[in-house]
């Protein structure tokens, strides 16, 4: 949204219409944030959006994730943590339960709202973020 609360581009991404203008504007804004936060040779770890149990919401979130992933791919110092893949079922769709990498047991990872992660899901996500940090430290010569 703009400062005056108006929408920069009037479109609902993922709704089936032409979202080219929306994607372009969102990419511009996401890229600017990435460049700002990742400046001065800093590594930015960007955590993606998980899918939702509502297919309409998921369609919109997928568009956002696609744009963010494309912008991250243009920037070697941006690491994208893919929550979509981590918290999806075998078919790539919404999953309430996923395999916990700590013990390989399938567990409930979602809050009751069908989107947010519960404590177990947050712990699994924290493992992925920690791994991204370790990988970056190793790339910088750290003994991790």
Which residue stretches match the model-derived regions?
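Alpha-helical cap/lid subdomain in secreted, periplasmic
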Residues: 1-119, 123, 127-141
């Amino acid at each position: 949204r703009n400062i005056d609360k108006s929408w920069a581009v009037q479109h609902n991404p993922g709704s089936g219409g032409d979202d080219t203008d929306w994607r372009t504007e969102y990419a511009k804004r996401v890229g600017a944030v990435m460049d700002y936060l990742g400046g001065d040779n800093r590594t930015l770890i960007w955590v993606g959006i998980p899918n939702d149990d509502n297919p309409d919401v998921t369609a919109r979130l997928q568009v956002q994730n696609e744009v963010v992933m494309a912008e991250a791919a243009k920037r070697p110092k941006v690491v994208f943590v893919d929550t979509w893949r981590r918290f999806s079922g075998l078919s790539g769709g919404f999953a309430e339960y996923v395999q916990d990498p700590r013990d390989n047991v399938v567990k409930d990872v979602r809050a009751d709202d069908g989107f947010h992660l519960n404590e177990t899901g947050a712990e699994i996500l924290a493992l992925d973020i920690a791994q991204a940090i370790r990988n970056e430290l190793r790339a910088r010569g750290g003994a991790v």
